[in-house]
Amino acid sequence: MDTDRTGLAAMPLHAITAELGEPGLRERLAIETATFPDPDRLRLARALELAARLHAADRRQREPYVNHLLRVAIRIICYYHITDPDVICAALLHDAVEDHAAELAASGSQPDALAVLAAQFGDRVADLVGDLTNPRYEPGRDSREQYREHVEASLDASPWARVVKASDFTDNGLGLIHATGPAFSRLAAKYAPLVPVLAGLIARPDTPLRDDVKAHILDQFGRAQDRFTAILTAHHAGYPPHDAGQPPHDAGQAR
């Protein structure tokens, strides 16, 4: 990689992704964790390699899925000012059980997969991942409604899981910049109902983030809601989603 470490540390996450891809994001995570105690850095490295192995065949739009996991973790360190290794491990592994329970545990059950994570990374990491894992939905009920209900209930009692979810939600919203066709309206319909739920959770006094960080996240959520509304309005009116306003302000740029 030609970019020096000083330059890489100052680059927005979207620029690292576009110009340097996974190697650049891995290096940025290494920079951000360079001062962590050795045991914490080693545990984070193990979490990243497990996540990379589990999601090796997964893609997000035009990129490897691991890029998403890296950005979620880096954003928590750089922009949320969180250095708790359990929280960062959970960020790297937050989709592992939901998407790959069968690779973690022979039974394929989510509780057994979480037990494997607990044995490897500790109970707190497994608990956070569990709070961030969507259950298998009931047939016959609207999946988006069940998703919203699960997020609201699971994060209500898990302040640190809210931190990971805020970064995950911010990064997921970036998919709307690159999505085309029906994907625009599907994603907007999925995420729009979550904005007020997550905003309320982030604003709570027990959410362990600085006030200025909360304010920034809430501003991003508000702009994301405007974007989702524009996409859905255009969809119902029959306009191309590309004309539905602009991407959320600085989501995935500096932060």
Say what each PLM segment does:
Residues 2-245, 250-255:
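Active-site helical microenvironments for divalent-metal-assisted chemistry
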